[in-house]
């Protein structure tokens, strides 16, 4: 989990940036949540705090950058991120939300079967 020292650095950065912004200029604070997660840091507390710190400025938006897994989309929405950047493969997986587990499993097996036939390997 994110150490309190590292967490404080992120919070201080957002606080400093937020102080510099006014209510007249559209602004985006981009937080590279995926990179935090890549090194074992939980980005959720930082994003939550950033949204809280900036919520009084209606022209400031928080961006959850570097989504690594589909569930990050849900986390970002729940925390109030206004912008979420996702690679195409993650967008495709998000489109599976709401599918039954059985349907997703069947679709995966069918895709695997198609790929294995294309490879001409025998299974």
What are these regions (language model features)?
Residues 93-122:
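C-terminal helical cap(s) of enzyme catalytic domains, especially alpha/beta-barrels
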Residues 8, 32-36, 65-73, 89-91:
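Active-site beta-loop-alpha junctions enriched in small/polar residues
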Residues 7, 39, 62-65, 101:
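Glycine- and other small-residue-rich loops at beta-strand/loop junctions that grip anionic moieties
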Residues 28-29, 39-58:
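Short loop-to-alpha-helix "cap/lid" segments that border enzyme active sites
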Residues 11-20, 69-81:
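Catalytic cores of alpha/beta
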Residues 13-38:
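Bacterial c-di-GMP phosphodiesterase catalytic domain signature
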Residues 4, 26-30, 59-63, 82-83:
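Structural preference for beta-strand elements that scaffold enzyme active sites
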Residues 1-6, 10:
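Single conserved hydrophobic/aromatic residue that forms the stacking wall/gate
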């Amino acid at each position: 989990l994110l150490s309190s020292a590292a967490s404080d650095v992120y919070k201080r950065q957002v606080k400093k940036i937020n102080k510099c912004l006014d209510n007249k200029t559209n602004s985006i604070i981009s937080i590279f949540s995926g990179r935090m997660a890549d090194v074992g840091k939980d980005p959720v507390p930082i994003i939550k705090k950033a949204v809280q710190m900036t919520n009084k400025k209606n022209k400031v938006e928080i961006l959850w950058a570097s989504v690594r897994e589909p569930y990050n989309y849900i986390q970002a929405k729940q925390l109030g991120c206004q912008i979420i950047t996702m690679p195409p493969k993650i967008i495709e997986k998000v489109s599976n939300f709401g599918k039954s587990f059985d349907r997703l499993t069947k679709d995966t097996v069918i895709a695997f079967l198609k790929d294995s036939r294309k490879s001409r390997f025998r299974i």
